[in-house]
Amino acid sequence: MMPANEDKENNIVYTGNESSGINFPQTPAHLLKRSHSNILKPPVRLDQLKRDANSNNGNTLKYIQGGKEVSPTKRLHTHAQQQGRLPLAAKDNNRSKSFIFPETSNQSKDADLPQLQNTLSIRKNDQLRKLSQISRSRSRANHNDLLSNSRKLQKYGSVLGYNALPKMKSLVLKDLADSGKNEESSDDDEGNEDSESKLGKKLQSALLKQDSSDGENELNGGLGLFNEQGGLQQLIKNSTKNEQKTKNDKSDKTDDYDIEIAPQRQEPLPYVPEGYSPFQQDDIEKLKTFNSPYKLDLEDEDDTPDKVDLLPLEQIDEEGEKDETECITRNQEEGAALPLLSKNFKEVAAVPTMELVYSEEGLDPEELEDLVT
């Protein structure tokens, strides 16, 4: 079985007031926020209201919660803030505030309905009066503008009822049935006839021709597209005639076709990069037969060495070079220079002589030990 406060959709019922019989589902407090189980506090009931004897002779009521007086609006505001989220039954904009005192709120609404209707009707009547006044003022302004402006009077005078205004020329064409009457009236108005005689005659002649052509078409048996002489049938006849003419022209002019010939395709030019001058065939042959000025023709006809401009080679004796090197080394050994001593030394110390020439013999083991140590 499910615990008592677990079915939050149906079983949990919130009663806003003891006197009111309205119930609606409410989510339990411990399911809204698990960390704080006592967030939703029950609303203040009538038995929790206490009278304040110090103000207004004890007639006012105040909310007393935790030993402090709290106003009803502040109580509702804090209650809505602490709620966290709206209950599941209040998701359709049914706030919990409206269910605290439902009877009093409904009664006040029912009592205020006629007053609201009266105020709305008064506002509508005021708006209609303002609109009518604005429209009247605008019509009067337009009327005054027409009277002050001569052009507007000439255009719209007959509409406004001013029949004494000068008549304007109309672009509407007169009927042909009244042609006789127009001719009789034209005898009276000779001045106007001079200006409009040419154009009127042209229009009348064109309309008479059109009427005569319509009468002939009726006699021939058809009007418009279904006429035998000038309609769909005539178009069909003309198209067949044109097709026959084109066939005859093709048969006569079979040899006169303009044959289109494409131009001969040219070979593409070779690719030449920028800054590169290609060698011609003459240049290549010159390079093949080029004679350098440093080239020597040693093979002459006379085979004489006088013509060759070269220095003769000197022959060097290797034995003589060896003798010279030996003499130089001996002189160096004999004429070894004495070391320069300062003037303070009276006794000349014996300076050991060193062999300058390597005798091609390595060091003894004793000498090697001396070097290492």
UniProtKB/Swiss-Prot annotation:
* Residues annotated with Phosphoserine modification: 185-186, 212-213, 277, 292
A GO biological process this protein is involved in? cell division
Q: Which GO terms describe its cellular component?
A: cytoplasm; nucleus; separase-securin complex; spindle
The entry's keywords = Cell cycle, Cell division, Chromosome partition, Cytoplasm, Mitosis, Nucleus, Phosphoprotein, Ubl conjugation
One Pfam family, short name: Securin
Leader sequence segment? none
Question: What happens upon changing residue 277 to A?
Answer: Affects phosphorylation and the interaction with ESP1
Q: Where on the tree of life does the source sit, at the highest rank?
A: Eukaryota
Query: Region Disordered: which residues?
Result: 1-27, 177-278
Please list the GO terms describing molecular function: enzyme binding
**What transmembrane ranges does the database entry give?**
none
What result is annotated for mutating residue 292 to A?
A: Affects phosphorylation and the interaction with ESP1
Q: What kind of modification does the protein receive after translation?
A: Phosphorylated by CDC28. The phosphorylation may be important for ESP1 localization to the nucleus. Ubiquitinated by the anaphase promoting complex (APC) at the onset of anaphase, conducting to its degradation.
Motif position, D-box: 85-88
What subcellular compartments does it reside in? Cytoplasm; Nucleus
InterPro entries linked: Securin_separation_inhibitor
Stretches with biased composition (Acidic residues): 185-194
User: What segments bear the compositional bias annotation Low complexity?
Assistant: 225-235
The record describes its quaternary structure and partners as: Interacts with the caspase-like ESP1, and prevents its protease activity probably by covering its active site. Interacts with CDC20.
Name the job this protein performs. Regulatory protein, which plays a central role in chromosome stability. Probably acts by blocking the action of key proteins. During the mitosis, it blocks Separase/ESP1 function, preventing the proteolysis of the cohesin complex and the subsequent segregation of the chromosomes. At the onset of anaphase, it is ubiquitinated, conducting to its destruction and to the liberation of ESP1.
Q: What is known of its domains?
A: The N-terminal destruction box (D-box) acts as a recognition signal for degradation via the ubiquitin-proteasome pathway.
Q: What is this protein called?
A: Securin
Q: Which organism is it from?
A: Saccharomyces cerevisiae (strain ATCC 204508 / S288c)
Gene symbol of the encoding locus: PDS1
